[in-house]
């Protein structure tokens, strides 16, 4: 289970509420569970209920995973950009030349699909092809 502070950050983020440190404070009074000790209602609105925190957390968690999936996909695409240049697989321009450019194009298409529409669950990325060069 996520900490109360993480649940609050999730609630504020999902509801597009801008906050700064000090707008709320959590803590554990002696012998009690973690709770909200102070809440800036003028800036943040009404203090959220546990039900609101519970509802926001999985949405926020999905958004975090989605953002990570997109970041990973963009990085993988960037790392293989060189495979798409016209000269890399053309004997007229390059010797040696890449003989399996089609494998890279297929790979990049699958990765691009994740980058364009990142899932909210951890993505399964395809395996990058191994470069094969003419001899």
Please provide the spans of the model-predicted regions.
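A preference for well-ordered globular domain cores
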Residues: 1-135
């Amino acid at each position: 289970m996520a900490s109360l502070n993480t649940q609050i950050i999730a609630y504020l983020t999902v509801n597009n509420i801008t906050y700064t440190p000090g707008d709320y404070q959590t803590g554990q009074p002696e012998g009690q569970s973690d709770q909200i000790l102070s809440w800036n209602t003028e800036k943040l609105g009404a203090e959220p209920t546990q039900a609101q925190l519970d509802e926001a957390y999985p949405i926020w968690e999905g958004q975090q995973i989605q953002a990570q999936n997109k970041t990973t996909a963009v990085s993988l695409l960037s790392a293989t950009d060189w495979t798409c240049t016209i000269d890399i697989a053309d004997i007229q321009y390059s010797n040696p030349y890449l003989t399996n450019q089609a494998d890279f194009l297929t790979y990049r298409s699958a990765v691009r699909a994740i980058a364009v529409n990142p899932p909210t669950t951890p993505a399964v990325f395809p395996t990058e092809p191994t470069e094969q060069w003419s001899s």
